[in-house]
């Protein structure tokens, strides 16, 4: 097996946090919101210029496609809150049993939710390395 030897280096610590969420798609955004709402110091890293992942970057527009079956039980939670906030702004379209969100308005909704929760937002960044002692 080949190895790459890296010289010792000093890397400045940009910030410290209790919870670091990398990626702000529906799952990452929900995880960061849940942690911050529990009072935990939370940072959210996103490589693009806005939060929302597939909702805002690929124009999928929904996270509830699974509701097409009438037997589906919806757990509610933060995903339902995304939809409710979009409805309040007339920024969603009901199709069958789910909502298609206006992707541009959802960018604003996601920003507001991040700010309201007190999350430290980090846009246009990627995670390269986590130091071993703090890896979880």
What are these regions (language model features)?
Residues 13-25:
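Beta1/beta-strand and adjacent pyrophosphate-binding region of the FAD-binding site
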Residues 1-6:
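Short gly/ser/thr-rich secondary-structure transition/capping motifs
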Residues 22-23, 46-47, 132:
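The Walker A (P-loop) glycine that initiates the GxxxxGKT/S ATP-binding motif of P-loop NTPases
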Residues 8, 16, 34, 40-41, ...:
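Conserved N-terminal/central alpha/beta ligand/cofactor-binding core
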Residues 126-136:
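Residue-level detector of conserved catalytic or cofactor/ligand-binding positions
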Residues 28:
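N-terminal Rossmann-fold NAD(P) dinucleotide-binding loop
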């Amino acid at each position: 097996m080949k190895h790459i030897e890296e010289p010792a280096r000093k890397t400045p610590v940009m910030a410290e946090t209790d919870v670091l969420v990398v990626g702000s798609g529906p799952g990452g955004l929900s995880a960061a919101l849940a942690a911050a709402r529990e009072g935990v110091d939370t940072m959210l890293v996103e490589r693009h210029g806005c939060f929302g992942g597939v909702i805002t970057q690929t124009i999928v527009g929904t996270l509830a496609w699974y509701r097409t079956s009438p037997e589906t039980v919806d757990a509610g939670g933060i995903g339902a809150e995304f939809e409710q906030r979009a409805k309040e702004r007339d920024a969603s379209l009901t199709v069958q049993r789910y909502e298609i969100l206006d992707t541009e308005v959802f960018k604003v909704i996601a920003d507001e939710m991040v700010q309201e929760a007190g999350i430290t937002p980090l846009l246009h960044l990627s995670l390269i390395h986590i130091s071993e002692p703090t890896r979880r």
